[in-house]
Amino acid sequence: MAKKVVDIKKTRIKISAFLFLTAIFALIVRLGYIQIVAGPTYSQEAMKQQYKDTVIYPMRGIIYDRTGKELAVSVPKNDLWIEPDNIKDSEKDAAIETLSKILELDKEEIKKSLSSGKKRFALAKNIDSDKVKKIREAKISGIWFEQSSRRYYPYGKFASHVIGHVSNENVGLAGVEASFNTYLKGIPGREIFIKDARNREISTNSLSYNEPVNGRNLILTIDEVIQHHMERAMEQALVDNNAKRVIAIAMDPQTGDILGMVSKPDYDPNDSRTPLYPLFQEKIDAALSDEEKLKELYTMWRNPAVNDIYEPGSPFKVVTASAALEEGLVYPEEWFNDIGYTEVAGRKIKNLTSKPFGSITFTKAVEQSVNSTFIQIAQRLGAQKFTEYITAFGFGKPTGIALPGEGVGMQYTVSKMGPVELATTSFGQGISVTPIQMISAISAVANDGKLMKPRIVKEVTDENGEIVESFEPEVVKRAVSKTTADQMLAIMESVVANGSGSATKIDGYRIGGKTGTAQKVIDGKYQSGYYISSCAAVAPIEDPQVALLVIVDEPKGASYSGSTISGPVVRQIMQDILRYLGVKPNAQAVIENNDSKIVIPEIRNRKYSEVAIELEKLGIGHVLDAQQEIDTSGIVIDSFPKPGDKVPQGSSVMLYIGSSTDETIIMPDLSGKTVKEVTELLKNMGIEFTPVGSGKAVKQMPSAGTMVKKGNMASVEFE
């Protein structure tokens, strides 16, 4: 019996030893697995709890105008995040008190957020650096800052279709922000530091720090002053004509540089999802889904000057005429006979006016925009030659401008261009082009016949201002010879001097131009009452420095012709540009009717009551803009005609009145004024300034004509 008990005990000991050894073996195997197989994984998890890995976002590159003015900048952005579970109960009240005081937030709101049950949330965004420093010094547990940057556009909706905007993630969505996103975005960096259980940084020294690489900067060809002049004129044209939209492009014909590009209605890139005009607001409100809403937003963001096509009408006659002149198929003083229409393949194609011109020279036919004459010269060219010249002037293919979504346009191939198509294309009907193609073709005539690639970005620079990449002016091809281009310019000058372009005349300057009135195609048919009014111009003829195209889409009023709708707008913009560029009036052009005219004095930035009295003394009347809510105690912010223009005695000047509280004013021309005179003038305007030297003003910044905000600083040099 005793032996049996001993055997049982031995068996139990053996079993216990076996189980113990098995457990030890299993533990060793498990430890081996953890150490060898799962070790890296657990090590990473442990490191995650000990270390904090933070992405450091780069600053997106700055976008400048051609003179160095900042059009798009990145502002540092600090967002404060909180993990409520990592704040000790004993520290919670003190943390709420500190955050409320520094961030100027309501204590109860902070308490409510902390008890919301969220694991983490952003308590405040876009915190300035001083507040960030104070919060860091408070060493509050359970909080951290996420650092990035936000995009800011100092001029608001200024050139919004050209500049574009970015997403919340700082990715370019439109304009050069999109097409040059790779240059602008930069490369993110990383920072790793040790943290405690409450998510607080233990050491001020990073274990690892990879510095971000900031984005490259862009220098555009756009000139801020020219763009502002164009924006103002086109906004007025949109309102005055109750138009669907308006477009304007100013180009340096010798380089292809885009000096200004305006499309309205536009939007504010600082708040890109909020429409500024009823047209877009109504469509977005009517959208039934997020997808439809986004589609309407993209429509608002697209740039019609580059993306959209239209039938150009009579400005296209410049291409037809240039082709015929180049081929020697017509000469300026050749006579044609007009009976008011032309029959082509059994179809009667009429002129814009039903009255026949009878015997008329080619130059006069261009002046009066006689369709029948252009049909005849297109027939002389034939479909093959005509399409070759259309292509030579850059139509039917992208211009290559560095903006997203460029349109191509539509034109007939030789096989598709029958007699009727040949006839209608000759005067710009039945062919679709983009505005950027049209202004490029006009510029080719102003550039000795050479077609330039439109340039919107001049250079890419690093953050030190060193040039990384340059985009030089590029000749695409020669469209016509210099001789032909000179002939065409002379004819275009005659159009302004004697023909349909007379509304673009500027006293003292030689201007060439061509107006157009094109009926719109809607649902596949030309619709009565729907027109595109346009005008293209070049100045000065003796040395072309500016080519300008203005388009008014669907003007609603007594007139819809390009000569009465777009011509005056071209005149206003061209006059502003030429003066800003310092182009002096041509002596020969100044002589005409000088003695019988009165020079409008500088009346901008002066009280309306004073201006009215001064104009009356000069024998000039005035009218106020009916579109404005007039404040007769306000300031004259602009006029039409402009100061410096000559007007007949007894004529009237349109005055644009702004409230004395308006923030934006026009920088006056200070040249020749004394320190005392400048001090008094700028003080009344609310502009501070620093005088340099003594005597009379010889140089100023900002330059005359620039739009500035009250309170801005000006610098004036005196000699």
Residue ranges of predicted features:
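Residues at or immediately flanking beta-strands
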Residues: W144, N217, R245-I247, W335, ...
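Beta-lactam-recognizing serine transpeptidase/beta-lactamase-like catalytic domain environment
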Residues: A72, D196-E201, N205, Q254-P315, ...
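Short, flexible turn/loop "capping" segments at secondary-structure junctions
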Residues: A72-V75, L114, Y155, Y209-V213, ...
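Periplasmic/cell-envelope proteins involved in peptidoglycan metabolism and beta-lactam response
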Residues: M1-E282, P304, I309, Q384-G394, ...
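Short glycine-rich loop/turn motifs
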Residues: A159, G215, I219, R245-A248, ...
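Extracytoplasmic/periplasmic beta-strand context in beta-sandwich domains
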Residues: G61, V246, E334, G340, ...
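Ligand-recognition elements built from short beta-strands and adjacent flexible loops
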Residues: F471, K505-G508, I522, G529, ...
